[in-house]
């Protein structure tokens, strides 16, 4: 299929030219290097036709304008010079668009991201639809890059430097009304009149540059700029811990453009883009992007999924409420909640109401969309309305007998084809299905808390689960907006199994005298979003540690927690944030205070809080325990491949994305280095650090988890 058909020029009777963007055979419009020739050809036709009064760029796709540049294009660059040349080509095309003497309008519906927004910025005006699908942003920083086709230069001049810095440094995406407020778009209209509104803009004289607010004009001046960049630089360094080189380059490039002029800015942008594309951080972040894209396309099994028309949820607690919310709001599926009393149902309904109403208040959705989603959720204290549920997700207490009774109830009250999916985090799925009449329709579907925020789910078939059941539940998880990985029915599954030794080692550091904040800060500096001790406080100390005895029983002493630490904390009624008592102090509700450790915890666990280890030593011990267990999971086929293992750790735990996940990280270190580090730690701290056989064999044979060509630095 010819790539030249991605851009089509049509000149209307009123002499307004419309370029329709429609990349053939693909759901999303992305910009590819080979499109440059065609865009230039169209621009030449427009320049040569003196009757054309205006030009409009619009997409033929139902939910995206242009979702960004094709990432494969960057991956194919073999050097910084090649990647820099890609940026220069993009800049030149955008300059040609901007240089047209007639008004050029971007008519935006759906995702307008990365190179898509850079194209829109090159236009003279922008109009977008007032639709939930429409978002505008420059998310390149999330791939370890910066906008390379003029975005770092045009955006500050259009919306002001402080707004531009916030958008480019964080990858923040603006919704239509936000974009209008900051001046990123000129009009917001209903989808039905998008083209009409764009034509009206194109028929007007080219508008003068937008008049920036006084604050933005001050910040663009030398003194204001110096103060702003100094403050933002410190804040960014504090947040990234120096782990994301793209953020510093973004600041440098934008400042260059403002202080030395746009020509210098464009040159600096292209050079920085080329150099960043070759960094290990960008390569790792792009690998996560590719891996998550692949996982989202993976059907889970080769058998076609069963029907997905209506869902049931057992239990109206925190997890049940969250599962119901994503099923209705993301999946657009009717969901019926069954609880033992009306209080549980009301809790789940209120949970969805609060989340949806918050979206309305933030203008992310309309009140009518909120009401439509809520109308999909209903409740019952018996099994009425469950007869025709295709999947029933169980989210009750972690009690084996109770869950087995739930299986029996579903088999009694639901249809013969109904799938029973358990949200257990610790009980074997095979045990839950032990007494089932239809064990092939029993499966694990492990969500992470809070359900509406955490992107990962683990799909856990037991040995009798059918391929169709797997395919159906994987499809449901995707409908719910989740990234599913299929894992084996072994104690702890995957995510909790690699998390537990990491948490245990952090606890050991405390018993050896390390301070709580030093341990947490060490792991945050390493790249985790929060430290292991704070993580326990956030998820609930009781919840976060309940899996450890299960793992200890299954795998032995390497999962043994340091003696009496957890029990001492729990016996003092410390559950973390949820009851305001944990390793950290919590202010009264509604009051904000700086995070502070509760010093009384040291007495509870007989620790001094006077440790001598460096941040690197603390992080190394915790992370190496996680890596060793991840390698065991790979060997035991708990995960299907390294890809799923990396996605599970990054999306489920917050493993540093710029390292690409535990398996890419081990590949970058080399198995020999990982084994040597583990052996050194084992000699210092005990046999729990003994490297697993898989790692030792890989070290001996110089093997990798990922195919070599997928981890080799591009040079």
UniProtKB/Swiss-Prot annotation:
The record marks 118, 140 as: Important for catalytic activity. In the N-terminal section; belongs to the enoyl-CoA hydratase/isomerase family. In the central section; belongs to the 3-hydroxyacyl-CoA dehydrogenase family. It is found in: Cytoplasm. It catalyses: a (3S)-3-hydroxyacyl-CoA = a (2E)-enoyl-CoA + H2O; a 4-saturated-(3S)-3-hydroxyacyl-CoA = a (3E)-enoyl-CoA + H2O; a (3S)-3-hydroxyacyl-CoA + NAD(+) = a 3-oxoacyl-CoA + NADH + H(+); (3S)-3-hydroxybutanoyl-CoA = (3R)-3-hydroxybutanoyl-CoA. PANTHER family: TRIFUNCTIONAL ENZYME SUBUNIT ALPHA, TRIFUNCTIONAL ENZYME SUBUNIT ALPHA, MITOCHONDRIAL. Heterotetramer of two alpha chains (FadJ) and two beta chains (FadI). It comes from Enterobacter sp. (strain 638). GO terms for cellular component: cytoplasm. This is Fatty acid oxidation complex subunit alpha. GO terms for biological process: fatty acid beta-oxidation. Gene3D superfamilies: 1.10.1040.50, 2-enoyl-CoA Hydratase, Chain A, domain 1, NAD(P)-binding Rossmann-like Domain.
């Amino acid at each position: 299929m010819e790539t030249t058909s991605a851009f089509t020029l049509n000149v209307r009777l009123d002499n307004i030219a419309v370029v329709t963007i429609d990349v053939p055979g693909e759901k999303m419009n992305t910009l590819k290097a080979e499109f440059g020739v065609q865009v230039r050809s169209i621009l030449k036709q427009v320049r040569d036709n003196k009757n054309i009064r205006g030009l409009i760029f619009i997409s033929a796709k139902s939910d995206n304008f242009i979702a960004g540049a094709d990432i494969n294009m960057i991956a194919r660059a073999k050097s910084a010079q090649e990647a820099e040349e890609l940026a220069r080509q993009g800049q030149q095309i955008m300059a040609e668009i901007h240089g047209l003497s007639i008004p050029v309008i971007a008519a935006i519906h759906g995702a307008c991201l990365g190179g898509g927004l850079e194209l829109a910025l090159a236009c003279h005006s922008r109009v977008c639809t007032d639709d939930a699908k429409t978002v505008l942003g420059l998310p390149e920083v999330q791939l370890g890059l910066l906008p390379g086709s003029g975005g770092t230069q045009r955006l500050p001049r259009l919306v002001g430097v402080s707004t531009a810095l916030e958008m480019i440094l964080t990858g923040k995406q603006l919704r239509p009304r936000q974009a209008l407020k900051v001046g990123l778009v000129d009009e917001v209209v209903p989808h039905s009149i998008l083209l009409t509104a764009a034509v009206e803009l194109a028929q007007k004289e080219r508008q003068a540059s937008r008049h920036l607010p006084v604050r933005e004009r001050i910040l663009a001046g030398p003194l204001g700029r110096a103060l702003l960049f100094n403050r933002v630089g410190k804040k960014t360094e504090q947040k990234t811990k120096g782990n994301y080189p793209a953020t510093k380059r973004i600041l440098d490039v934008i400042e260059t453009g403002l202080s030395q002029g746009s020509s210098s800015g464009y040159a600096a942008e292209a050079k920085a883009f080329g150099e960043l594309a070759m960094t290990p951080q960008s390569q790792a972040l792009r690998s996560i992007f590719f891996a998550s894209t692949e996982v989202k396309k993976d059907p889970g099994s080769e058998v076609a999924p069963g029907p997905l028309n209506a869902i049931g949820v057992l239990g109206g607690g925190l997890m049940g409420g969250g599962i119901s919310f994503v099923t209705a709001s993301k999946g657009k599926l009717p969901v019926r909640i069954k609880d033992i009393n009306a209080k549980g149902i009301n809790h789940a309904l209120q949970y969805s109401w609060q989340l949806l109403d918050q979206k309305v208040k933030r203008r992310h959705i309309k009140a009518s969309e909120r009401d439509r989603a809520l109308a999909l959720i209903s409740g019952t204290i018996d099994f009425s309305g469950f007869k025709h549920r295709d999947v029933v997700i169980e989210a009750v207490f972690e009690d084996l007998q109770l869950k087995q009774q739930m299986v029996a109830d579903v088999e009694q009250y639901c249809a013969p084809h109904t799938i029973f999916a358990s949200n257990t985090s610790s009980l074997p799925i095979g045990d839950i299905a032990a007494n089932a009449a239809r064990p092939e329709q029993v499966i694990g579907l492990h969500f992470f808390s809070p359900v509406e925020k955490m992107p990962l789910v683990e799909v856990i078939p037991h040995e009798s689960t059918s391929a169709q059941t797997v395919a159906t539940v994987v499809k449901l998880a995707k409908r719910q907006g989740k990234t599913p990985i299929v894992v084996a029915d072994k104690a702890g599954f995957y995510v909790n199994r690699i998390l537990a030794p990491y948490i245990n080692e952090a606890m050991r550091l405390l018993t050896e005298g390390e301070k709580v904040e030093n341990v947490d800060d060490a792991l945050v500096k390493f790249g985790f979003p929060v430290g292991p001790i704070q993580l326990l406080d956030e998820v609930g100390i009781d919840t976060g540690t309940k899996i450890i005895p299960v793992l200890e029983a299954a795998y032995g002493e390497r999962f043994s927690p340091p003696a009496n630490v957890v029990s001492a904390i729990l016996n003092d009624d410390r559950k973390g944030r949820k009851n305001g008592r944990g390793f950290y102090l919590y202010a009264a509700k509604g009051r904000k205070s700086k995070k502070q450790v509760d010093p009384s915890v040291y007495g509870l666990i007989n620790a001094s809080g006077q440790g001598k280890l460096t941040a690197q030593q603390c992080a190394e011990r915790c992370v190496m325990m996680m890596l060793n267990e991840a390698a065991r999971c790979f060997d035991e086929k708990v995960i299907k491949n390294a890809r799923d293992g990396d996605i599970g750790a990054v999306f489920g735990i917050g493993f540093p994305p710029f390292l690409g996940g535990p398996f890419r990280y081990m590949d970058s270190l080399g198995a020999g280095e990982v084994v040597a580090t583990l052996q050194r730690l084992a000699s210092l701290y005990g046999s729990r650090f003994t490297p697993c056989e898989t790692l030792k064999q890989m070290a001996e044979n110089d093997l990798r988890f990922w195919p070599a060509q997928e981890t080799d630095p591009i040079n």
